């Protein structure tokens, strides 16, 4: 087998997900672009009907219902940006270390827009199978986001 420069055997080995490491990296690059385009439909297309998505802000969703939850976030933060700071791939488990920024421009979960910006870091833990995300656990400080956009007050420590 001839490899492109900079490519390792590990990059080309298919995992249980049916994907190579290189394909997994491409999937998450495409997901980052979909976040930047506020494209909930493309993001939801990476899930199966039985996928489980757990989120501090939206609760637990099954399947492509995640599109509705993402749509609500995208509607509230029209300038939302997401950056993949690091991607850790261990077999069919992928952890994306992420940074988010945006401005609260429209209602969110019943809170009127404040016009305030937020910056948030977090990690999304994904399990892949058959080229799809079958489980996603989002870990981030949702309370901190609410404080930053001014809809929740916090007392100094």
List the predicted regions and their residue ranges.
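Conserved functional loop/turn residues at catalytic and ligand-binding sites
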Residues: 39, 81, 132, 150
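A solvent-exposed, acidic/Ser-Thr-rich amphipathic alpha-helical stretch
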Residues: 21-25, 29, 40-94, 98-101
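Short, low-complexity N-terminal intrinsically disordered segments enriched in polar/charged residues
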Residues: 1-49, 60, 154-157
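Short beta-strand edge/turn micro-motifs at domain boundaries
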Residues: 2-5, 95, 119-149
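Exposed beta-sheet edge and beta->alpha loop/turn motif
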Residues: 102-130
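Juxtamembrane/interface motifs at transmembrane-helix termini
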Residues: 63-66, 117, 154-157
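Residue-level signal for pocket-adjacent positions within structured domains
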Residues: 10, 48, 103-106, 113, ...
């Amino acid at each position: 087998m001839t490899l492109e420069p900079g490519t390792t055997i590990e990059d080309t080995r298919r995992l249980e997900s049916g994907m190579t490491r290189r394909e997994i990296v491409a999937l998450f690059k495409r997901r980052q672009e979909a976040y930047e385009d506020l494209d909930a439909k493309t993001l939801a297309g990476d899930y199966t009907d039985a996928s489980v998505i757990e989120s501090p802000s939206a609760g637990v969703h099954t399947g492509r219902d995640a599109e509705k939850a993402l749509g609500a976030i995208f509607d509230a933060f029209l300038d939302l940006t997401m950056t993949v700071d690091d991607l850790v791939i261990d077999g069919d488990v992928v952890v994306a270390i992420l940074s988010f920024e945006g401005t609260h421009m429209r209602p969110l979960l019943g809170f009127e827009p404040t016009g305030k910006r937020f910056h948030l870091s977090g990690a999304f833990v994904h399990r892949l199978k058959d080229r799809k995300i079958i489980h996603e656990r989002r870990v981030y400080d949702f309370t901190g986001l609410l404080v930053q956009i001014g809809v929740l007050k916090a007392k100094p420590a």
